[in-house]
């Protein structure tokens, strides 16, 4: 068995930059994606279906993460068949079920290998999120802001 560079860090970096451009608040999903790895591949894959209706930018972040994961796995294990289709929750149940059943065909060893790579990808996404996330507001009030607020509200002093 030869060593294969998965390029997980590079993929994670690109995913975070794209998500930040799309909607910087969607980066909060990085932590939830990492936590959802504990529930397995199938549930991680299905997370974009759950988010699609109410939080589409977060769903896109999960979807793009899954696509990057599939790309990584295809380059390292072309023989491995994992669901690569990213469906919408409006798809026919037959189509969703057919795609989800691909998980059942994976051996335990293949599932473990895939999950290890997915966890590494999500860990890298969290790492890059912590470094690249844009702040929506400054963490501390400026001294001038505090002085102005106390001038406008004499009861606060």
Cite the ranges covered by each PLM segment:
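Small/polar/charged residue-enriched interaction surfaces, especially the RNA/DNA-contacting tracks
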Residues: 1-157
